[in-house]
A protein has these predicted regions:
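Conserved small/polar residues in nucleotide/adenosyl-binding loops
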Residues: 100-107
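Core catalytic region of metal-dependent phosphoesterases/phosphodiesterases
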Residues: 2-96
Length: 111
């Protein structure tokens, strides 16, 4: 099983779309989101392409492929619109992990 790991979308449809294109291109089976999905936080500027409603739509379209851990900018109200669980502070994954010496820039495995 191939996992893609991402975090800190902060409501940016621009970066969410880039992430989902990489998810498709890399043919990953699951997407592990490490929080901060919709809100940008009170101390941060609005990210490029800030459109949380669009992010909701994009992520709900692949909800069965997402495992999410709550970030510091995620709130209970976010769970009302996202169709996959986000409120757990932790999750247990029982998958084998392999390590490689290839760097992301050598394989093109980056956004």
């Amino acid at each position: 099983m191939k996992w893609m790991i991402a975090s800190d979308i902060h409501g940016s449809a621009f970066y969410c779309e880039k992430m989902l294109k990489a998810f498709e291109r890399e043919q990953a089976d699951k997407l592990l989101l490490l929080g901060d999905i919709l809100y940008h936080g009170p101390r941060n500027d609005l990210p490029k392409g800030y459109a949380p409603k669009k992010v909701i739509e994009l992520l709900n379209n692949i909800k069965e492929k997402i495992l999410c851990v709550r970030g510091n900018c995620d709130a209970e109200v976010d769970q009302m619109v996202l169709e996959f669980p986000i409120m757990a502070d932790y999750a247990m994954i029982t998958e084998a992990v392999s390590y490689t010496h290839l760097r992301a820039h050598e394989t093109g495995a980056y956004l």
